[in-house]
């Protein structure tokens, strides 16, 4: 059973969110160009540990703002962490990529994107970022271009991309690295899958675009990889890619067979493709949770669906928002699910484990005073950029098709998972 631990209201529509790989930090990028980092309550935190920087939440914990700044003119489109969590990168509709500290928000380096093509003076517009390795940053754009940037020792950006590919004719909606081969010496991926428009493409760091799919006649909006356990017979260790579409269908692709999809799971279909709810976000369920081969999918009607990839069916559904679609999904380092969409972020965890954590916390008392130990948290200052709440550009929508205005069925604060309780 999943339980909503806390709810975070935002000052503008959420475009992107990321979580730190080893710390309880959540960073959001908003439609008004603001970027803000929050500290999520952990198992060691006290429910009474509140201060003036706390945000309104549920009864299980307090989310605190660590820093906030007006990072981009226009909207903040995308965020990504470095592989070690020491650096954060953002990109906005101002065609600028910024590198900054996750702890303080202070900018360390920044670059501008090159023109869309040789005949244009207009800069390309970023759509998505992904850190492939400690040395490589990928950036996909609205024009369908893919830029590869080298990263220096401290994570700083080199001003010029080392390579440029054009795998798609429409904006790049997702970037998913493929697991490295057994012969890999670095342990980091060298190939990745991108989606854009109605096609999927595979690109190699050294050799460029390796494969492009057939036209799928539906928008491909999000993707995640399942490294093992779902491949065809006699090839169970072959990776499988799950791709969410605009028509509410989750398609499965076997690694190496990139021409066309192999399986279809109807997650939020309609009577026709146009009636289906868009699948805008997806994340693989961590193996540590013991749920099996499952993925969590964020839907345009505001619902979140747990999909059993082996049984090819939706296992359960719960509600993130009554009106706005789910734009982002993550699991943090404590394997809690974080859903974001509209002007709300919610943190979810298994109800049983949350109750056990509370009981353990009650037992941790000072020997002399018999009181809970407070959990400390230091708030950091913003960088020197504009930080006025009045700086709010007009609301801007992503290019991807959205159906978030349709109301979904009401969902309670906790959700049962058959076979997972």
From Swiss-Prot:
Signal sequence extent: none
SMART domains in UniProt: WD40
Region (Disordered): 39-58, 351-421
One Pfam family, short name: WD40
Biased composition range(s): Acidic residues: 44-53, 355-366, 378-388
Organism: Neurospora crassa (strain ATCC 24698 / 74-OR23-1A / CBS 708.71 / DSM 1257 / FGSC 987)
Listed GO CC annotations: nucleolus
Main location per the UniProt record: nucleus
Entry's family note: Belongs to the WD repeat WDR55 family.
Entry superkingdom: Eukaryota
Gene: jip5
Locations listed in the record: Nucleus, Nucleolus
Keywords: Nucleus, Repeat, WD repeat
Name of the protein: WD repeat-containing protein jip5
Repeat (WD) residue spans along the chain: 9-48, 71-110, 120-159, 220-263, 277-317, 321-358
Record keyword Cytoplasm present: no
PANTHER family referenced in this protein's UniProt entry, alphabetically: WD REPEAT-CONTAINING PROTEIN 55
Biased composition (Basic residues): 395-410
């Amino acid at each position: 059973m999943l339980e909503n631990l806390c709810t975070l209201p935002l000052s503008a529509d959420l475009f992107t969110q990321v979580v730190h790989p080893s710390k309880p930090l959540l960073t959001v990028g908003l439609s008004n160009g603001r970027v803000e980092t929050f500290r999520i309550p952990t198992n060691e935190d006290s429910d009474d540990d509140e201060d003036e920087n706390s945000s309104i939440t549920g009864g299980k914990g307090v989310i605190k703002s660590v820093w906030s700044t007006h990072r981009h003119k226009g909207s903040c489109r995308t965020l990504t962490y470095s592989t070690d969590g020491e650096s954060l990168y953002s990109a906005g509709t101002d065609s600028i990529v910024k590198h900054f500290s996750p702890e303080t928000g202070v900018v360390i380096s920044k670059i501008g994107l090159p023109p869309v093509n040789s005949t244009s003076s207009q800069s390309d517009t970023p759509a998505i970022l992904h850190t492939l390795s400690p040395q490589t940053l990928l950036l996909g754009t609205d024009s369908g271009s893919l830029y590869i940037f080298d990263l220096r020792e401290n994570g700083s950006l080199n001003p010029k991309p080392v390579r440029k590919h054009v795998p798609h004719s429409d904006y790049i909606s997702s970037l998913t690295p493929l697991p490295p081969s057994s012969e890999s010496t670095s342990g980091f991926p060298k190939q990745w899958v991108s989606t854009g428009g109605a096609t999927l493409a595979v690109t190699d760091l050294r050799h460029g675009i390796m494969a492009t799919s057939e036209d799928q006649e539906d928008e491909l909006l999000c993707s995640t990889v399942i490294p093992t356990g779902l491949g065809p017979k006699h090839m169970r260790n072959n990776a499988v890619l799950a791709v969410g579409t605009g028509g509410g269908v989750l398609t499965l692709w076997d690694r190496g067979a990139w021409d066309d999809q192999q399986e279809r799971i109807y997650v939020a279909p309609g009577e026709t493709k146009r009636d289906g709810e868009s699948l805008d976000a997806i994340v693989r369920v961590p193996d540590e949770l013991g749920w099996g081969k499952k993925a969590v999918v964020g839907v345009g009607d505001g619902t979140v669906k747990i999909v059993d990839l082996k049984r090819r069916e939706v296992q359960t559904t719960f509600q993130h928002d009554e009106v706005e679609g789910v734009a982002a999904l993550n699991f943090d380092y404590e394997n809690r699910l974080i859903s974001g969409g509209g002007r709300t972020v919610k943190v979810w965890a298994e109800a049983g484990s949350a109750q056990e954590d509370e009981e353990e916390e009650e037992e941790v008392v000072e020997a002399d005073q018999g009181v809970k130990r407070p959990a400390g948290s230091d708030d950091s200052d913003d960088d020197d950029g504009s930080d006025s709440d009045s700086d709010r550009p007009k609301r801007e929508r992503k290019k991807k098709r959205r159906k978030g205005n349709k109301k979904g069925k009401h969902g309670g604060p906790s959700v049962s998972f058959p076979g997972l309780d």
